[in-house]
C-alpha cells in the first residue's frame, strides 16, 4: 500500500512539474452556467460590445450573475457605430427585455428563446428571416420595417403585442389572428393580397400604403367590431400607376376620424355609419360620387 501511495504522489508531482515547465499554467474551467465569450459570440464587433458592456470582471466569460443582469441590449447603428452581421449568441441573455439592433447588417435573427422580451427593434437590418419568441407574455412592440422578410409566423398568442411594424418587406401573407391587443399596425409596401383584421378589434391606427396586390380592404364593423379604428392610410405612394385597391369598406366604424386612400383603383367606397370622420382623402380613384350623409 505504501509503495502505491508513493507512486501516485510521484506521478502527480511529475505532472505538476511538467505543466510548470511547459508554461501551461493553471487550467481555467468555467463554472456551471458560465458562457465563454469568444466561442459564443461569433461576430467580432458584437463580441467586442458584449465584452465591453457585460463582462464586468473582464475574465472572458459571462457568469450567470452577469447574464441575468442584462435586460437591455442596444447595438443600433445610431448608438453603436460598428457594423454587426450576426447576433449569434444573443439567446444566452434570457432576462433580456429590450433589444434594438436597427440599422445593422443582420441577415437572420432568432429570438425564439428570449421569453422576457418587451420590445424588439430590428428595422433596416437586411433581414430575410426572423423568428419570434416562442412565448413572450410581455412583448408589446415589434419593429421589422425596411427588411426583406418573406414570412413571419406568430406561433402563439401574443396577448400584450400592441404595435407591429413590418413596412417595406416582401410579405405575401400574414396571419394576425393571434394578436388580439394590436393597436398600431403598419403593413405598407408589401405584396399582401389579403388583409384579414377580423380578430384585431382593438386596432386604432392602420397603415397599409402601396399594397400592389390588395384589391379589397374590408375594415368595416359588419362582421367584426372596428369602432376603435381612428386612422387609416391605404394610399398608393409608388411613382407611376395606381394602387390595386378597388373596394374599401369602413361601414359602421364610428371612431374613424381620418381616411386616406389616394391613388388607388377604388370604385366602391362604403362608409355608412362612419359618423366621426373629419378627414377624407380619396383623390386619384375611380369614385364617381360619395354619400357622406349617413
Where do the language-model regions lie?
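Serine/threonine-enriched low-complexity regions in disordered or flexible coil/loop segments
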Residues: 81, 211, 237-238, 242
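Short, intrinsically disordered, charge-balanced linker/junction segments flanking boundaries
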Residues: 288-294
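Conserved hydrophobic beta-strand positions in leucine-rich repeat
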Residues: 73-77, 99-101, 120-122, 140-144, ...
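A generic tandem-repeat structural signature
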Residues: 114-124, 131-136, 143-145
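Short glycine/acidic-rich loop motifs that flank beta-strands on beta-rich extracellular proteins
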Residues: 127-128, 149-150, 171, 192-193, ...
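N-terminal capping/linker segments that flank leucine-rich repeat
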Residues: 2-12, 16-98, 115, 137, ...
Amino acid at each position: 500500500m505504501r509503495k502505491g501511495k508513493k507512486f501516485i504522489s510521484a506521478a502527480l508531482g511529475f505532472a505538476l512539474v511538467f505543466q510548470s515547465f511547459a508554461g501551461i499554467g493553471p487550467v481555467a474551467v468555467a463554472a456551471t452556467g458560465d458562457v465563454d465569450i469568444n466561442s459564443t459570440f461569433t461576430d467580432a464587433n458584437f463580441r467586442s460590445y458584449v465584452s465591453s458592456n457585460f463582462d464586468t470582471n473582464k475574465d472572458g466569460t459571462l457568469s450567470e450573475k452577469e447574464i441575468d443582469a442584462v435586460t437591455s441590449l442596444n447595438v443600433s447603428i445610431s448608438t453603436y457605430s460598428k457594423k454587426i452581421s450576426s447576433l449569434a449568441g444573443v439567446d444566452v441573455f434570457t432576462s433580456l427585455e429590450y433589444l434594438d439592433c436597427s440599422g445593422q447588417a443582420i441577415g437572420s435573427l432568432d429570438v425564439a428563446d428570449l421569453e422576457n422580451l418587451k420590445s424588439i427593434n430590428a428595422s433596416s437590418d437586411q433581414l430575410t428571416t426572423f423568428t419570434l419568441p416562442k412565448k413572450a407574455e410581455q412583448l408589446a412592440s415589434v419593429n421589422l420595417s425596411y427588411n426583406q422578410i418573406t414570412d413571419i409566423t406568430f406561433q402563439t398568442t401574443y396577448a400584450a403585442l400592441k404595435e407591429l411594424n413590418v413596412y417595406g418587406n416582401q410579405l405575401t401573407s400574414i396571419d394576425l389572428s393571434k394578436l388580439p391587443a394590436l393597436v398600431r399596425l403598419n403593413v405598407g409596401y408589401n405584396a399582401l393580397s389579403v388583409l384579414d383584421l377580423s380578430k384585431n378589434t382593438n386596432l386604432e391606427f392602420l397603415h397599409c400604403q402601396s399594397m400592389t396586390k390588395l384589391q379589397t380592404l374590408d375594415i368595416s364593423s359588419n362582421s367584426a367590431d372596428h369602432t376603435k379604428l381612428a386612422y387609416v392610410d391605404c394610399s398608393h405612394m409608388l411613382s407611376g400607376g395606381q394602387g390595386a385597391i378597388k373596394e374599401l369598406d369602413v361601414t359602421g366604424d364610428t371612431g374613424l376620424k381620418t381616411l386616406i386612400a389616394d391613388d388607388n383603383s377604388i370604385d366602391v367606397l362604403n362608409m355608412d355609419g362612419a359618423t366621426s370622420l373629419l378627414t377624407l382623402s380619396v383623390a386619384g380613384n375611380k369614385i364617381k360620387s360619395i354619400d357622406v350623409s349617413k
